């Protein structure tokens, strides 16, 4: 009888530990799916900008699944000569590491260089992604684009639900 009681206690402790592991895996699985989707949204913006010649200043329009038409500005400036801070050209501020500075408020990013893109999923679920970019004119024939995206709810660094922002960079020319 005593052995059965001890076995049941050990089993209960083991199942309790397994339930916490299960919850952590559910959180990280959802986080991974949002991380993949934010990379795809950033890639979409990158492809749209890269499709134009480097010296083009033509604005593009992208429509999300909520029907919002977002303007994508393709005008860049030389490094430290535009709105992107000391390390960027035009657009969202860049850090010294050359990535989008997520400490900058969304409203502080110049119009045409940020959007809150809505992605629709199964069952009417929607996820909003904060997408920002910076364009650095390297010469009259070359431009560097840095695009970053993350879910809007990922405002805190660390934790199980934190999604590392995707940062994509390319150099396009004529």
Question: Each PLM stretch: what is its role?
Answer:
Residues 2-43:
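Aliphatic-rich helix starts adjacent to a transmembrane/signal segment
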Residues 40-174:
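Low-complexity, Gly/Pro-rich coil/beta segments used as flexible assembly/activation regions
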């Amino acid at each position: 009888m005593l052995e059965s009681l001890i076995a049941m206690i050990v089993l209960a402790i083991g199942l309790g530990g397994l339930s916490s592991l299960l919850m952590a895996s559910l959180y990280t699985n959802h986080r991974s799916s949002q991380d993949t989707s934010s990379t795809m949204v950033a890639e979409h913006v990158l492809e749209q900008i890269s499709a134009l010649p480097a010296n083009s200043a033509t604005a593009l329009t992208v429509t999300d699944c909520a029907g919002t038409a977002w303007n994508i500005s393709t005008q860049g400036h030389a490094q430290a000569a535009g709105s992107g801070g000391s390390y960027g050209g035009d657009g969202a501020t860049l850090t010294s590491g050359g990535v989008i500075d997520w400490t900058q408020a969304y409203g502080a990013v110049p119009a045409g260089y940020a959007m809150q893109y809505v992605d629709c999923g199964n069952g009417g679920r929607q996820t909003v992604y904060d997408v920002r970019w910076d364009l650095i004119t390297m010469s009259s024939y070359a431009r560097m684009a840095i695009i970053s995206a993350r879910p809007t709810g990922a405002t805190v660094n660390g934790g199980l639900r934190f999604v590392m922002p995707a940062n994509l960079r390319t150099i396009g020319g004529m």
